[in-house]
Amino acid sequence: MNKARIPIALQQAVMRCLREKLQLARQHFSVEFPEPKILYQQRGTSAGTAWLQAWEIRLNPVLLMENQQPFIDEVVPHELAHLLVFRQFGRVPPHGNEWRWMMESVLQVSASRTHQFEIASVQSKTYPYRCGCQLHQLTVRRHNRVMRGESEYRCRQCGDKLKFFAGEPV
């Protein structure tokens, strides 16, 4: 696998944002939250994930390199908010009222559930399948399950079994 190398200046910008937002939370709650570990291991189209028990944030290195400051301004506080909400409120819905409040009132960032970054460079290939009414795109994982005879998929509209349409992934 080709790993994206994150320039030290970009890693420092990530940490600067993390520490600024963490300081806002510390001041607001009068609690000394530990600094979460940052890993650049997130794959696929997700910009980042918060690992609650491990107290770590995993960031997508490709999307970070392609979007830099907008990524830092949006994704780092988003994932930090998940950790802080877990620490303060326990298990609650991931983008619920507590998370929204943490983003807007404590971290002073607008609460957005999803990123709007271009994902062409990190998007998986898909395979075309047909039913009676339309063309579907199955992921590599689902396609392989069909090929091995482990799964079959049906159209939600017409109910027909999906059939592999062509040899080339899209």
UniProtKB/Swiss-Prot annotation:
InterPro entries with a match to the protein in the record: SprT-like_domain (IPR006640), SprT_Zn_ribbon (IPR035240), Uncharacterised_SprT (IPR023483)
Keyword Zinc: yes
Major site of localization recorded for this protein: cytoplasm
Family named by the database record: Belongs to the SprT family.
GO molecular function, one term: zinc ion binding
HAMAP family: SprT
Binding residue positions for Zn(2+): 78, 82
A Pfam short name: SprT-like
PROSITE patterns, alphabetized: ZINC_PROTEASE
Gene Ontology biological process: response to stress
GO CC aspect terms: cytoplasm
Cofactor binding summary note: Binds 1 zinc ion.
Entry annotation: catalytic residues: 79
UniProt entry keywords in alphabetical sequence: Cytoplasm, Metal-binding, Zinc
SprT-like domain span: 23-164
Location of the protein in the cell: Cytoplasm
Protein name, entry field: Protein SprT
Cofactor: Zn(2+)
